Amino acid sequence: MKNRTFSVFYRKYEQILEKEILSSEIPEHIAVIMDGNRRYAGQLGKARIFGHAMGAEVTEQVIEWCYEIGVKQLTLYAFSTENFQRSEEEVGGLFNLINEKFLKLHTDKRTYEKEMQVRVIGDRTKLPAYLNESIDRIEKATEHHRKFSLNVAIAYGGRQDIMQAVRDIATCVSSGKLSLEDVNESLISKHLYPAPGVPVPNVDLIIRTGGDERISNFLPWQANGSECATYFCAPFWPEFRKIDLLRSVRVYQARKEEKKREHSYRISKVKNFLRVGKYENKSEDLGQLLPLKKQGVS
């Protein structure tokens, strides 16, 4: 009886929260650091691969939830370059699990009903042949889809991504294909994974589960460039709920509103300054607008 009551309350709260966030701007690009699979398994006395398998089930749900609320791009941190330091058994089990999910995406009618494009970002030279074959198959099957984009980061490291882009651009410059004047932010973005191709856009919101409050070398170019919102939550990835996703979107929306208020406040201060007309004696006041701190504005 108690569990049923809680379930009804939970569902009602979820509906209220979803209605609230749908009345405001939805982030176009969400990136997720899916942390806590191994600790989740450890708490239950299970093998690590059990935690990864449970996490993979949640991943399928999160793709659905993001699509439902209007997110356009979802990037998932599935396997970092540092993860290669784990045991051969665990790495092999992870690759098998990821491969199964790509095969399922390829045959799942929802992939095509949603017009979902699937791409992998990362150093694919480090991946086994069977996994690369599955990646090629799903990328080819969905390459013309544009309604929803799923980017899966495998063998990915943010610093390594920037380094390979810089090396590629340097090679183009030295061979005469590019000049130094051609190098700008847009060009660098085009040489990041999954180069060649449409670059992964700036991130609006990064979510990390499992309690750690760090970004872990994930999409540094796309995240810092857009000053994206971040949402850290305690549940391990297999415990992640739709309510957690909706709460993260609410944090993004609150941050957007805060930035709008700050911008309006600064503009009003500048207008007031110009209205007074004491430019020479008050010029130093303009510099105070940059580090401005006011109650309700940060």
Swiss-Prot record:
Belongs to the UPP synthase family. Signal peptide: none annotated. Catalyzes the sequential condensation of isopentenyl diphosphate (IPP) with geranylgeranyl diphosphate (GGPP) to yield (2Z,6Z,10Z,14Z,18Z,22Z,26Z,30E,34E,38E)-undecaprenyl diphosphate (tritrans,heptacis-UPP). It is probably the precursor of glycosyl carrier lipids. Pfam families: Prenyltransf. Substrate binds at residues 36-39, 48, 52, 80-82, 84, 86, 208, 214-216. Its EC number is 2.5.1.89. It comes from Methanosarcina mazei (strain ATCC BAA-159 / DSM 3647 / Goe1 / Go1 / JCM 11833 / OCM 88). It is an enzyme of class 2 (transferase). The lineage of its organism: Archaea, Methanobacteriati, Methanobacteriota, Stenosarchaea group, Methanomicrobia. Its cofactor is Mg(2+). NCBIfam families: uppS. The keyword Metal-binding applies. One of its GO terms (molecular function) is magnesium ion binding. The active site is at D35, N83 (proton acceptor). This is Tritrans,polycis-undecaprenyl-diphosphate synthase (geranylgeranyl-diphosphate specific). Mg(2+) binds at D35. It catalyses: geranylgeranyl diphosphate + 7 isopentenyl diphosphate = tri-trans,hepta-cis-undecaprenyl diphosphate + 7 diphosphate. Binds 2 magnesium ions per subunit. Homodimer. Keywords: Magnesium, Metal-binding, Transferase. GO terms for biological process: polyprenol biosynthetic process. PROSITE patterns: UPP_SYNTHASE.
